[in-house]
Design a protein with these regions (language model features):
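Catalytic or ion-coupling anion/metal-binding cores of large enzyme and transporter domains
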Residues: 1-76, 80, 89-108, 119-121, ...
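Acidic/charged coordination and interface sites in well-structured regions
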Residues: 86
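A short, small-residue-rich loop immediately preceding and capping a beta-strand
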Residues: 139-161, 174-177
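N-terminal small/polar loop signature for handling phosphorylated ligands or for N-terminal nucleophile
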Residues: 105-143
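Contiguous domain-boundary segments centered on the initiation and propagation of an alpha-helix
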Residues: 129-136, 143-148, 458-466
Length: 603
């Protein structure tokens, strides 16, 4: 085991000692010696199975067979969630074969950040994670269930479902992905057309045709954003079946994996032979494995918040120091767009999760001694699923990367350090996705150009006001200010400026997600401008140093002058109403800082 891995893991265990013990005591208290519905009064139980078919009613009356909750995030607008339409029937059939019953316990909302980018609805995106967690909890609160299956893929859905699943941590749980769409227009070409559009060189129809050729079918988007990072991290944490993350939605193997997940959860229940509740399985070592997966693949920066919130739901306390220390020793072993030209399908073809797990285990950079839904030991995740005469089976995955331009070996990584860097200085703490930023662009010291909204940046770009070396500051985009939207509209114009050979960086208390590209971006700045952060005192022309190599984020202004300045707090009333935002004010006010998970749920 790598010494830093061991030190960070032990530090988290010690830091979480009291909160983890309290959590485990709570889920132990919730565990019963019989099926959970046995605690219900007859009237309660009759309501619970009133709509079931006769055989299922008889099974539920008997108090002998498991009843498995299905929590689904199906809707047919999200390409990644459209395949879930028919999963409940696949699951019920598999459960019947295992002498169990399945009920859809509830549905949760699932919004698409791709649809809401640059729109008012994006200000509800991060808040939707909390709503998803609470919605799933309501579905599970009926106390009818002995285990749960979670159908979710995209950005806030998997973290929200995980938070809910851990609140019901006495139940065994398995997560079921839907898989990626087939590859479409290459990501590099898509970005080229976006930048041409930003420069006014192609029209809107050309842009729309490009986007439609990229996002064109059921399944997750193929770039390595938050959705695919979710799947990577959750598989490394042992919460879904080995090799299940990146199988296409319409592949026969996908249906076989879905059915297998249903059968597996029945064996993990109290009256199965592999009892393993999620709350026990999801421990400090599992959390560290999730962080390693994020760093080794250059995954979405959103997970510097999501993993914090997910861990806290299990009584585990992590912070950005843990990410930073691990990033110093975890090498970058995957090159996926925006960190390289390959997409998630190329990653799967290059050996996928099994070969990546194998390489990291070889380097002593994963905790192998963990419980997973596949059994004890993370080495089980070096296996890959396949159909053996039509039946699901597992075999050893690739023993080395099949494409060294997509997956590297531990001995010859793409970088000796992980894909995420924590920055610190008088402006606060922030994160940078360094895996997508060329080394020569990771250090900049330049005057600030300050904006209060991403919508003001494009007019300034078009007017030529940014044709210079500068640090673009977009503030009052943090959790409490306006829900911490993602600011992807900034990337095309800032990318153009980089191509024009200007030294450019972005500093913001907002988010950029997994699509953070070649622009060096210090994001998630905390404390946020709206909540006392120094970012609120930055003025046009102030020198800012952003160093993605040493981890520095410094406002180079005399301390006495800064002390004399008043923070600038703009009128944010426009972000308080419309598109349903008026209903989320109470949640927004309670959100914690980015490093604390940007959550309003107190565990």
């Amino acid at each position: 085991m790598n010494s830093t891995m061991l030190r960070v893991t032990n530090r988290i265990i010690e830091r979480s000692r009291d909160t983890r013990a309290a959590y485990l005591a709570r889920i132990n208290q919730a565990k019963t010696d019989t099926v959970h519905r046995a605690q219900l009064a007859c009237g309660n139980l009759a309501h619970g199975f009133a709509a079931c078919q006769a055989d299922d009613k008889a099974s539920l009356k008997s108090m002998l067979r498991n009843n498995i909750a299905i929590i689904t995030s199906y809707n047919d607008m999200l390409s990644a969630h459209q395949p879930y339409e028919h999963y409940p029937e696949i699951i019920r059939k598999a459960l019947h074969s295992a002498n169990a019953v399945g009920q859809v316990a509830g549905g949760v909302p699932a919004m698409c950040d791709g649809v809401t980018q640059g729109q008012d609805g994006m200000e509800l995106s991060l808040l939707s994670r909390e709503v998803i967690a609470m919605s799933a909890a309501i579905g599970l609160s009926h106390n009818m269930f002995d285990g749960a299956l979670y159908l979710g893929v995209c950005d806030k859905i998997v973290p929200g479902l995980t938070m809910a699943a851990l609140s019901f941590g006495h139940l065994p749980s398995v997560f079921i992905p839907s898989g990626p769409m087939a590859s479409g227009l290459p990501n590099k070409e898509k970005v080229r057309i976006r930048q041409l559009y930003a420069e006014g060189k192609v029209d809107r129809m050309a842009l729309l045709e490009s986007e439609a050729a990229s996002y064109h079918a059921p399944g997750t988007c193929t770039f390595y954003g938050t959705a695919n990072t979710n799947q990577m991290v959750v598989e490394f944490m042992g919460m879904q079946l080995p090799g299940s993350s990146f199988v296409h939605p319409d592949a026969p193997l996908r249906e076989a994996l879905t059915a297998a997940a249903a059968r597996k959860v029945t064996r993990m229940t109290g009256n199965g032979n592999e009892w393993m509740p999620l709350g026990k399985m999801f421990d400090e070592k599992v959390v560290v494995n999730g962080i390693v997966a994020l760093l080794a693949t250059g995954g979405s920066t959103n997970h510097t918040m999501h993993l914090v919130a997910m861990a806290r739901a299990a009584g585990i306390i992590i912070n950005w120091d843990d990410f930073s220390d691990l990033s110093d020793v975890v090498p970058l072993l995957a090159r996926l767009y925006p960190n390289g030209p390959a997409d998630i399908n190329h990653f799967q073809a290059a050996g996928g999760v099994p070969v990546l797990v194998r390489e990291l285990l070889k380097g002593g950079l994963l905790n192998e001694d963990v419980h997973t839904v596949a059994g004890f030991g993370l080495s089980r995740y070096t296996l890959e699923p396949w159909l053996n005469n039509g039946e699901l089976d597992w075999r050893e995955g690739a023993t080395a990367p099949l494409d060294d331009q997509v997956i590297a070996t531990f001995e010859k990584p793409f970088s000796r350090h992980g894909g995420t860097k924590v920055l610190s200085g008088n402006l606060g703490r922030a994160v940078m996705k360094t895996s997508a930023v060329p080394v020569e662009n990771q250090v900049i010291e330049a005057p600030a150009v300050v904006f209060e909204s991403q919508h003001d940046v494009l007019p300034a770009f078009e007017a030529g006001l940014l044709d210079k070396d500068c640090v673009v500051v977009v503030r009052h985009q943090g959790p409490k200010a306006n829900g911490m939207p993602e600011l992807h509209k900034l990337m095309p114009p800032l990318g153009v400026l980089l191509d024009r050979r200007f030294k450019i960086a972005l500093v913001t208390d907002g988010r950029l997600s997994g699509a953070s590209g070649k622009v060096p971006s210090a994001i998630h700045v905390t404390p946020e401008a709206y909540d006392g952060g120094l970012l609120a005192k930055v003025r046009d022309g102030d020198l800012i140093r952003v160093n993605g190599q040493t981890g520095e984020l410094t406002l180079l202004v005399d301390e006495a002058e800064l002390a004399a300045r008043q923070p600038h707090i703009p009128d944010l009333s426009a972000s308080r109403v419309g598109t349903g935002r008026e209903m989320f004010g109470a949640l927004r006010e309670k959100l914690s800082g980015a490093e604390q998970g940007a959550t309003c749920i107190t565990f």
